[in-house]
C-alpha cells in the first residue's frame, strides 16, 4: 500500500504508535472490494507507516481509529490497496476480501486447479522442445 501510494504521488508517514493486532476497520461497503460486508470488521493490522495523503484519483474506503487510510481505491484504474492482512485467520471475513478482489474486481474464473496447470505446462513444453533434448 505504501509503495503504490508513494509511487503514484501520495504521501506516506510514520505513525506515532505502531498498530498491531486485530483492529476494527470502518469500511465503505459500497466498494466492490467490500461487497457483502458490515460497516465495521476486524482485521489484523501490523504496521508503523501509514498513508497520510492518498494519490490523485484514489478515495478512502476504510479507516481505523489510528489509521486514516486503511483501504483506498481508484476504480478508474482498477487499483486497490489495503493496510491490513486479509490472509490470516484472525481477520474476520478476510477470505471474502480476497474473493471479492479475485472474482468481482479481477474477473478471475475460479476454475483453476493445479493439475490442469501442470498438464498445460507439460504440453506447452513438449510442443516447444519437440524431439530435442
Predicted regions and their residues:
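RNA-binding accessory domains that recognize and position tRNA/RNA substrates
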Residues: 6-133
Amino acid at each position: 500500500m505504501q509503495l503504490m501510494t508513494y509511487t503514484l504521488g501520495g504521501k506516506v508517514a510514520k505513525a506515532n504508535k505502531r498498530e498491531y493486532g486485530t483492529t476494527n476497520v470502518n469500511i465503505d461497503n459500497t466498494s466492490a472490494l467490500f461487497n457483502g460486508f458490515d460497516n465495521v470488521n476486524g482485521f489484523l493490522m501490523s504496521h508503523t507507516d501509514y498513508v497520510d495523503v492518498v494519490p490523485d484519483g484514489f478515495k478512502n474506503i476504510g479507516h481505523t481509529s489510528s489509521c486514516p487510510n486503511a483501504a483506498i481505491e481508484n476504480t478508474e484504474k482498477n487499483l486497490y490497496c489495503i493496510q491490513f492482512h486479509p490472509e490470516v485467520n484472525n481477520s474476520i471475513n478476510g477470505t471474502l476480501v480476497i474473493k471479492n478482489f479475485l472474482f468481482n474486481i479481477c474477473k478471475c474464473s475460479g476454475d483453476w486447479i493445479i493439475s490442469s496447470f501442470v498438464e498445460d505446462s507439460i504440453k506447452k513444453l513438449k510442443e516447444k522442445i519437440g524431439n530435442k533434448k
